[in-house]
């Protein structure tokens, strides 16, 4: 058998992939950047009576792999499936796909806005975990970042204070989950979390101890920021271009302002459109 080469833009088939999705890099190729658009609404999936919720969850996850702008969330506490997407059109497409591919007739409840949380001032959080025969302590610096930066993690800790292996473990625990804020429990964003200090015990420290200490340090830092009014709730917003006839520009501007929007000065095109 000989190797087969494809040029950029050509379509080919690859076997043996188990966790591939749009944007995944193969071999030396890096994964593509995150989608520019992120879901802004969340809906609860209402399954038919008697339907297997876990089987439905698996089917939704398969569709999620095909569509990067669809996020499927399993709420273990409530035993509910939630989908996060852009709006009603995508919702109708999802409903149609589930019916056509899997014969699954689902409904969705009224959607809710996907808020996020951040901080407005740098603060330090400390997490201490010391039950019997366990020990770990983590000091984190939480800093705000410009809008659209997402979450960033780093370490600035001396090895004399905390061994490099433990430092890497703390970073792993920071990156492995979606951290939630303390205002409404929304996901954190636009924040840098840096490991600045930590302690371990030669005899009693185990890997799971640093997971607990790390999560507690994040939480404690957020609680401290909230006490001094340095936490902030973020809501999604849209940037778009609106083209209307010149005689309708006043009404359009009034409607945008009425919905708490803002706009740049209007521009008139040669055909009279504004």
Where do the PLM segments sit?
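Accessory interaction regions appended to the cores of large information-processing enzymes
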Residues: 2-274
């Amino acid at each position: 058998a000989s190797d087969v080469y494809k040029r950029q833009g050509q379509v080919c088939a690859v076997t043996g992939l188990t966790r591939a999705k749009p944007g995944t890099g193969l071999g030396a190729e890096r994964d593509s950047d995150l989608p520019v658009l992120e879901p802004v609404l969340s809906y609860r999936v209402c399954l038919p009576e008697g339907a297997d919720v876990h089987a439905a969850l698996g089917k939704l996850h398969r569709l999620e792999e095909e569509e990067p702008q669809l996020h499927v969330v399993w709420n273990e506490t409530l035993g509910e499936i939630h989908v996060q997407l852009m709006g009603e059109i995508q919702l109708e497409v999802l409903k149609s796909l589930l019916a056509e591919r899997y014969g699954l007739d689902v409904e969705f409840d009224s959607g809710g806005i996907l808020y996020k949380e951040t901080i407005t001032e740098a603060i330090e959080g400390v997490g201490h975990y010391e039950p019997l025969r366990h020990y770990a302590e983590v000091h984190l610096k939480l800093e705000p970042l410009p809008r659209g930066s997402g979450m960033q993690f780093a370490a600035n800790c001396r090895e004399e204070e905390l061994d490099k292996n433990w430092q890497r473990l703390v970073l792993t625990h920071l990156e492995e989950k979606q951290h939630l804020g303390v205002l409404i429990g929304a996901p954190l964003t636009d924040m840098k979390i840096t490991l600045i200090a930590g302690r371990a015990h030669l005899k009693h420290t185990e890997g799971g101890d640093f997971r607990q200490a790390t999560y507690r340090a994040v939480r404690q830092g957020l609680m401290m920021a909230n006490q001094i009014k340095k936490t902030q709730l973020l809501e999604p917003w849209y940037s778009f271009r609106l083209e209307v006839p010149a005689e309708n520009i006043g009404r359009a501007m009034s409607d945008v302002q009425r919905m708490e929007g803002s706009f740049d000065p209007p521009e008139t095109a040669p055909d009279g459109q504004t």
